[in-house]
Amino acid sequence: YVDEFIFGIANNKLISAKTGTGEVDLQARYLRFDDYTFLKKGEDRSAYSTRLWPTAKGSHLALFPNLNNNNKVLQSILRDVRFRRALSMAVDRYEINQVIYYGLAIEGNNTVLPESPLYKSYYRSRWAQLDLKASNKLLDDMGLTERDSRGIRLMPDGNPLNLIVETAGESTEQTDILELIHDNWLKIGIKIYSKPSQRNVFRNRIFAGETAISIWSGIENGLASANSSPAEFAPTTQQLLQWPKWGQNFETDGK
């Protein structure tokens, strides 16, 4: 039995620093993978051990195209499954794993984990292998064949396919990953810009249909079973970043 627990209240931005100086005995929340190197360096000095624990989410981070984007031309593009598959096959997950996660991550899609009884290996691997040739072909098949002088594909309205990927601004890890994605998406004629903000602004922009793509953690329950709620996989709530307006419509009975 433990005689006493003492919970210290601190700004979440200070948690990793306080942990690294040995001020806490046990800490998990508010420690991110981008704190890993800093924490490992402090082990001998502050007499603690840094442990890596697997997450129960479908993916540590995932990209969410907003199928309810207000721009009707862009909305039509985002809703085309060929476009989303093209984006996925132009993400070099191996590079991200090596550069950001020191090769310690598992590469693949945002889906249930191998420990889930519903898991199938192709859920994680389908459209998740780097294949720029296949990506370019899918985009060509969509009719996005015209390009500007920079090589950026043009949308049907003549505007370049410049996409803003929005983040909650809480971690440099997300912007570092987007920098790596940026280089490969340029090779398929798509230019992206990362836009950090604050969490409430980030979510409100998504809910309002102002966001094209956002980056956030994957499905909450990566260990789903036949008895689990399937709500995360259908537009049942505004909180789901890929279809917030459909979710809102469901929650309000269309009102």
PLM regions with names:
Residues 1-102, 106-107, 115-255:
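Extracytoplasmic/periplasmic ligand-capture domains
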